[in-house]
Design a protein with these regions (language model features):
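Short, gly/Ser/Thr-rich active-site loops of penicillin-recognizing serine hydrolases
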Residues: 97-108, 208-236
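Short beta-strands and strand-coil junctions in structured, solvent-facing domains, enriched
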Residues: 199-201
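C-terminal soluble interaction/assembly domains
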Residues: 193-196, 209
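Short amphipathic alpha-helical face segments that pack within enzyme cores
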Residues: 65-71, 205-212
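Beta-lactam-recognizing serine transpeptidase/beta-lactamase-like catalytic domain environment
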Residues: 1-193, 236
């Protein structure tokens, strides 16, 4: 509440929310990053403190795509360096990549205290490897360290005096399971955003999917020896 919607809107926009930050992804949606002006224009209502509370946890009017979640996560992994999503990797022949793909146009995100990045990354590592980490089960047995955050997306609203019971709710109304993360934590090579529709638990449903994606990319595509050498601090 002390931060307020204006500051939240400013910083969330720097992480790519409320816009299409892709370079060549046709049909990418901007989501919805609400503001005072947006609510006044769309609903003819003022912005209430409760709206800020909802927005702070990604609920209420706020909407984000899985790609936007992955993009924002990459900013954390890269300590503020932008990598705008694109489908095209390279161009064969004499044509230069720059001639068919617009250059990245978003400025890197700088903060006054760089240690803040490390605090966030360390906290995300604890989610995966800490004694109380919500996704520690998904990271069990890994020979590399990963960073992540579990979550849920509410599908429908409960009454104030009603408790959520997944067993008694029809499947199509159950919470969506969410997970965002990257690996290796100390030398990021892959960022993922996972949503399992009506999956319920981010830690029990979405995080294991992300772990499988990490393993596939780091071990099968890039080679097990390379990831082990990076984990030991050697040059790949």
């Amino acid at each position: 509440l002390e931060m307020g919607v204006d500051i939240m809107h400013d910083y969330l926009s720097r992480f790519g929310f409320g816009m299409d930050a892709t370079l060549d992804v046709g049909g990418a949606l901007p989501g919805l990053l609400p503001s005072r002006d947006w609510k006044r224009g769309m609903r003819n209502e003022p912005w209430y403190p409760g709206d800020s509370v909802n927005m702070s946890i990604g609920q209420g009017f706020f909407l984000a795509t899985p790609l936007q979640l992955a993009t924002a996560t990459s900013l954390v992994a890269n300590r503020g360096e932008w990598v705008q999503p694109r489908m095209l990797k390279d161009v064969m022949g004499d044509t230069a990549l720059e001639s068919v793909l617009e250059p990245e146009y978003l400025e890197d995100l700088t903060i006054d205290n760089h240690d803040t990045w490390e605090y966030v990354v360390d906290s995300m590592e604890d989610v995966m490897h800490g004694r109380r980490g919500t996704a520690r089960g998904a990271a069990e047995g890994a020979d590399y360290r990963m960073a992540g955050k579990t979550g849920t997306a509410q599908v429908f609203s409960l009454a104030e005096d009603e408790e959520y019971d997944a067993e008694e709710i029809r499947e199509r109304l159950r919470d969506h399971a969410l997970f965002i993360g990257f690996a290796p934590a100390d030398d990021p090579r892959i960022v993922v955003s996972v949503i399992v529709e009506n999956g319920g638990s981010g830690s029990g449903t979405a995080a294991p999917v992300a772990r499988a994606m990490f393993d596939a990319w780091l071990k099968e595509f890039n080679g097990q020896d390379a990831i082990i050498s990076r984990a030991e601090g050697e040059q790949p």
